[in-house]
C-alpha cells in the first residue's frame, strides 16, 4: 500500500555511489552462502562495463531467485529490505543496460551449485555510476574472509589485471591472507596494475 510506495520512492533515490560498493555487497552474499570461491570479473570497453560475480555457494531455489531482486525481500532478520541485488539491477537498467541472475540450489544440484550475477552498464549514459575504488573492495573482501578464495579480473580493452587468492595461498603457505603485510602487498600490486 502507501507505506510500500513511499519506501520504493526512497529506495529508487538511494543507489550506491560506486559499482565497487555493489561488488563488495554481492560478494559478501556469496561468502554468506558458503562459497569457497567467488569470481569477480569487470570487463570494460569505452562504451560498456560488464560485471560478473559467480560463486560456488549453496545457491537459491527458483522461488527465492524470483524474489531476490525485490527490494522488499531479504533473508536477513536485521532489516526488512534487501538492497544489494535490487540496487545493482536498477543501476544497470537505468543506464539502458541489463541485469541477469541465475542460480542452482545445492539441494537440487549437489555437484554444481552456486549463483551468477551479470550486469551490463552503458558508460555513456547520464545515470552511469562509476566503477569507483574496486581495489579497496577486493582488499576488504580478502581482509574479512581470509579463508575464502577470490578470483578478480579487470579487463579494459587489451589490458588485464588478475588476482587469484589460490595462487597467493600456494606461495604463502601458512601466512594468512589477512595479515597486514599480505594485504598491503595485494593493495599496492593491484593499484599499480589498475592504472590501465
List PLM regions with ranges.
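Glycine-rich ATP-lid/hinge loop adjacent to the conserved G-boxes
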Residues: 73-81
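Acidic ATP/Mg2+-coordinating residue in the GHKL
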Residues: 55
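Short beta-strand-loop-beta element adjacent to the nucleotide/active-site pocket used for signaling
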Residues: 43-51
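Flexible, glycine-/charge-rich segments associated with ATP-binding catalytic modules
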Residues: 1-17, 90-196
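Short conserved segment of the HATPase_c
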Residues: 60-71
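Conserved ATP-binding N-box helix of the HATPase_c
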Residues: 16-42, 91
Amino acid at each position: 500500500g502507501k507505506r510500500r510506495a513511499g519506501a520504493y520512492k526512497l529506495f529508487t533515490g538511494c543507489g550506491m555511489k560506486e559499482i565497487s560498493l555493489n561488488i563488495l555487497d554481492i560478494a559478501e552474499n556469496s561468502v554468506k552462502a558458503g562459497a569457497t570461491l567467488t569470481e569477480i570479473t569487470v570487463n570494460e570497453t569505452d562504451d560498456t562495463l560488464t560485471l560478473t560475480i559467480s560463486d560456488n555457494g549453496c545457491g537459491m531455489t527458483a522461488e527465492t531467485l524470483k524474489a531476490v531482486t525485490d527490494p522488499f525481500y531479504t533473508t536477513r532478520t536485521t532489516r526488512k529490505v534487501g538492497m544489494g541485488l535490487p540496487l545493482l539491477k536498477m543501476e544497470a537498467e537505468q543506464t539502458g543496460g541489463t541485469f541477469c541472475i541465475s542460480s542452482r540450489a545445492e539441494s537440487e544440484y549437489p555437484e554444481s551449485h552456486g549463483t551468477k550475477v551479470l550486469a551490463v552498464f552503458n558508460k555513456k549514459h547520464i545515470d552511469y555510476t562509476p566503477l569507483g575504488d574496486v581495489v579497496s573492495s577486493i582488499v576488504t573482501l580478502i581482509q574479512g574472509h581470509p579463508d575464502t578464495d577470490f578470483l578478480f579480473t579487470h579487463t579494459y580493452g587489451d589490458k588485464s589485471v588478475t588476482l587469484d587468492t589460490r595462487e597467493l595461498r600456494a606461495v604463502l603457505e601458512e601466512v594468512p591472507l589477512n595479515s597486514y603485510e599480505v594485504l598491503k602487498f595485494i593493495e599496492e600490486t593491484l593499484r599499480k596494475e589498475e592504472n590501465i
